C-alpha cells in the first residue's frame, strides 16, 4: 500500500532503460509511457503528467550530453530532476521560538499531527507546548492532551469554552515559558463558511509565524482545491501530507499541493508519534527511485542513538560486545519501521518482500528479549556463554536454546563484519565523501 506501487513502477521503468544498449527516441518514448502509467495510477493530474512527459522528451533528445556521463545516465538524471519539480519545493522554517497555526478539514489527522510536531520540536531541543482550540469535535482536546502527556509536553484547552480566540488567548498566557506554540484548530466535513471565519479570526489574533495545512493523502489531486481555499483565507506557507503509508494517491496529493506554490513541510507516514518526516524533495524522489536518502538516514540515526551510547571507534578496533549490539538494535527500533529505514539506503531495484521485513523486525525484538535475560558479565563477555548458560537464558526469556544460539551466531557475524570495516576504514571514508557531495549526490550509484 502507500507509495510502494508507484515506487516499484518507477524503478521498473528506470531499470528497463538502464538495460537498453542504445538510448534513442524509441527508448525515450517507451520510458515516458512507463512513467505516465505509473504517475496516473497514483492519481497525478493528467495535465501535469503530460507536461512532465514533454519536458523529459525534449530535454533527453535535445540537450547536449554533459561531460563525464553517458546518454543513459543523462536521461535518468533528467527523469530525477523533473520528478523533483513535480512534487514541488520544501517549505522552509527555522528551529527557533515561533507560533504555528494548524489548519485542515476534520479527519485529516490534524490533532495527531499536532502531537507529532510537538515531538519533532522537542527532539530538536526546544521547549514546546500545544493549544487545543478545536471545540467543534467532541474529545478533540482530550486526544491532544493524551498525546502531549505521553511525551511530557504541556498543553492547554478548555472544552467548555466555545470562543476559539479566547482559548488561544488563555493558552498563550498559560504557555508563556515555551519556545514553540502549536495551535490545533477546528475542522469540518467540508470547507464551510463558519470554519473559514473562525480560523481567520484565530489567525488574526495569534499572528503566527507559520500557517500549516494538514491534508489527507487519500484526497489525491482533490487536495489542490482545499489547499487553494485555505491559502486564500489565511495564507498557508506549508503543507503536511498525512497517511502517506495508507493510500496509492499520495503522489497525486503532493503534486496537487505543489501547484498551489505552498511547499510541503512534513509527510506523515505511520501511526506512532515519531512517524513524521521532514520533507526534502530530492531525498523523497531518490527513495522512490530506489536510490536511497542518506541524509535522512544519518539524521534519523543521530536522533536515535546518542554519541555516548556506543563507542564506534572501540567497535572498529575489535571491541564489540553483546551490550553494544543491544544498543544498536534499540537504536534501529527507535528509527522507525525497518521498511522505512531500508528505503533510505541506495538499494536500486532490489525489493525486499514485506513478510521478510516483518520477520527480521520480529527477530530483532526477540534478540533483545533474550539479552534482557543475560547477566551484565555475559553481555560484556559473550565468550562466557556456554551450553548451560544458554539453557538458563532460554528459560528466563521464554525462548528455545536454538533461538539463543541464533543470537550468538548473529553477534559473531556482526563482530566479523566490523573487523572487516576496520581494515577498510580509508576506503569507507572515501566512499562516504563521494556520497555526501552536493548537487546530484543520490544519483551516484546509477
UniProtKB/Swiss-Prot annotation:
InterPro entries registered for this protein in UniProt: AAA+_ATPase (IPR003593), P-loop_NTPase (IPR027417), Signal_recog_part_SRP54_M_sf (IPR036891), Signal_recog_particl_SRP54_hlx (IPR013822), Signal_recog_particle_SRP54_M (IPR004125), SRP/SRP_N (IPR036225), SRP54 (IPR022941), SRP54_GTPase_dom (IPR000897)
Domain of life, source organism: Archaea
Localization terms from the record: Cytoplasm
Database matches in Pfam families: SRP54 (PF00448), SRP54_N (PF02881), SRP_SPB (PF02978)
EC number: 3.6.5.4
Recorded coiled-coil stretches: none
Gene Ontology annotations of biological process type: SRP-dependent cotranslational protein targeting to membrane
Similarity annotation: Belongs to the GTP-binding SRP family. SRP54 subfamily.
Transmembrane segments: none
Entry function: Involved in targeting and insertion of nascent membrane proteins into the cytoplasmic membrane. Binds to the hydrophobic signal sequence of the ribosome-nascent chain (RNC) as it emerges from the ribosomes. The SRP-RNC complex is then targeted to the cytoplasmic membrane where it interacts with the SRP receptor FtsY.
Protein name stated in the entry: Signal recognition particle 54 kDa protein
One of the record's GO molecular function terms: ATP hydrolysis activity
Entry domain remark: Composed of three domains: the N-terminal N domain, which is responsible for interactions with the ribosome, the central G domain, which binds GTP, and the C-terminal M domain, which binds the RNA and the signal sequence of the RNC.
Claim: Aminoacyl-tRNA synthetase is one of the keywords in the record: no
Amino acid at each position: 500500500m502507500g507509495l510502494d506501487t508507484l515506487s516499484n513502477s518507477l524503478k521498473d521503468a528506470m531499470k528497463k532503460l538502464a538495460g537498453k544498449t542504445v538510448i534513442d527516441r524509441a527508448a525515450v518514448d517507451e520510458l515516458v509511457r512507463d512513467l505516465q502509467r505509473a504517475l496516473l495510477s497514483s492519481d497525478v493530474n493528467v495535465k501535469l503528467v503530460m507536461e512532465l512527459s514533454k519536458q523529459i522528451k525534449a530535454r533527453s533528445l535535445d540537450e547536449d550530453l554533459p561531460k563525464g556521463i553517458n546518454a543513459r545516465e543523462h536521461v535518468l538524471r533528467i527523469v530525477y530532476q523533473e520528478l523533483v519539480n513535480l512534487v514541488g519545493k520544501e517549505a522552509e522554517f527555522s528551529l527557533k521560538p515561533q507560533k504555528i497555526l494548524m489548519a485542515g478539514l476534520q479527519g485529516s489527522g490534524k490533532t495527531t499531527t499536532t502531537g507529532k510536531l510537538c515531538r519533532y520540536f522537542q527532539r530538536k531541543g526546544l521547549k514546546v507546548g500545544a493549544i487545543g482550540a478545536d471545540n467543534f469535535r467532541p474529545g478533540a482536546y482530550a486526544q491532544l492532551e493524551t498525546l502531549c502527556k505521553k511525551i511530557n509536553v504541556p498543553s492547554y484547552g478548555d472544552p467548555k469554552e466555545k470562543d476559539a480566540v479566547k482559548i488561544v488567548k488563555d493558552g498563550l498566557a498559560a504557555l508563556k515559558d515555551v519556545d514553540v506554540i502549536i495551535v490545533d484548530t477546528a475542522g469540518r466535513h467540508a470547507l464551510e463558511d463558519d470554519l473559514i471565519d473562525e480560523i481567520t479570526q484565530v489567525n488574526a489574533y495569534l499572528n503566527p509565524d507559520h500557517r500549516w495545512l494538514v491534508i489527507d493523502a487519500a484526497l489525491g489531486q482533490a487536495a489542490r482545491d482545499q489547499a487553494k481555499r485555505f491559502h486564500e483565507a489565511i495564507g498557508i506557507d506549508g503543507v503536511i501530507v498525512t497517511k502517506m503509508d495508507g493510500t496509492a494517491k499520495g503522489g497525486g496529493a503532493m503534486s496537487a499541493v505543489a501547484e498551489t506554490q505552498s511547499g510541503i513541510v512534513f509527510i506523515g507516514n505511520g501511526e506512532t508519534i515519531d512517524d513524521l518526516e521532514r520533507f526534502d524533495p530530492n531525498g523523497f524522489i531518490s527513495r522512490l527511485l530506489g536510490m536511497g536518502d542518506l541524509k535522512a538516514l544519518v539524521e534519523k540515526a543521530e536522533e536515535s542513538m546518542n554519541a555516548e551510547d556506543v563507542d564506534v571507534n572501540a567497535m572498529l578496533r575489535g571491541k564489540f560486545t553483546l551490550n553494544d549490539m543491544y544498543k544498536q538494535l534499540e537504536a534501529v527500533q527507535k528509527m522507525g519501521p525497518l521498511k522505512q529505514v531500508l528505503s533510505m539506503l541506495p538499494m536500486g531495484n532490489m525489493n525486499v518482500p514485506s513478510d521478510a521485513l516483518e520477520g527480521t523486525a520480529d527477530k530483532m525484538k526477540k534478540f533483545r528479549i533474550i539479552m534482557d535475560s543475560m547477566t551484565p558479565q555475559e553481555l560484556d563477555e559473550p565468550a562466557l556463554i556456554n551450553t548451560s548458560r544458554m539453557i538458563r537464558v532460554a528459560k528466563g526469556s521464554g525462548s528455545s536454546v536454538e533461538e539463543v544460539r541464533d543470537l550468538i551466531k548473529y553477534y559473531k557475524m556482526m563482530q566479523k563484519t566490523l573487523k572487516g570495516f576496520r581494515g577498510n576504514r580509508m576506503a569507507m571514508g572515501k566512499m562516504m565523501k563521494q556520497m555526501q557531495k552536493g548537487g546530484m549526490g543520490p544519483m551516484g550509484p546509477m
